[in-house]
Amino acid sequence: MFNIKMTISVLLIALIVLLIIILVVFLYYKKQQPPKKVCKVDKDCGSGEHCVRGSCSSLSCLDAVKTDKRNIKIDSKISSCEFTPNFYRFTDTAADEQQEFGKTRRPIKITPSPSESHSPQEVCERYCSWGTDDCTGWEYEGNEKEGTCYIYNNPHHPVLKYGKDHVIALPRNHKHA
């Protein structure tokens, strides 16, 4: 009986020592990691990195969106996006108009100037970039020559779904993330 109690005591002490060693190694490893580089734009980061929520990161665009827009819901058919200087840009994607974010969709009349070489889609993006901080996303439906621009102004987290011939963009590092 005495040997069993002694064996259990030794095992408990060994387990506690092992846990302490693991904790010390973990804390040492955390201290050795270099701090993440602080950034405001992608140019502040190294090659292959993008500015995501104020830190340089090598996340894919889709993972960066999920980090930046914490409660975003993305249809499983949507497998990628593209970083632009101010937006996460999705092709063949639309906002779900039944959700809070999608209900704020309002059309904007786009008339590209004949003297400028910007497509209606680029004008739509510029409208959201130059507008107020209330622009929480833009969507373009149509082709390169003509289509409709929609602006969103609801800070609720978007629900994105597959939408043929739609392009939607969500602001990066936005105050409503």
From Swiss-Prot:
Mode of membrane association: Single-pass membrane protein
Stretches assigned to the Virion surface side: 29-177
Induction description: Expressed in the late phase of the viral replicative cycle.
Disulfide bonds: none
TM annotation in the entry: 8-28
Positions on the Intravirion side per record topology: 1-7
Keywords: Early protein, Host cell membrane, Host membrane, Membrane, Transmembrane, Transmembrane helix, Virion
Protein's name according to its UniProt entry: Inner membrane protein p22
Taxonomic source organism: African swine fever virus (isolate Tick/South Africa/Pretoriuskop Pr4/1996)
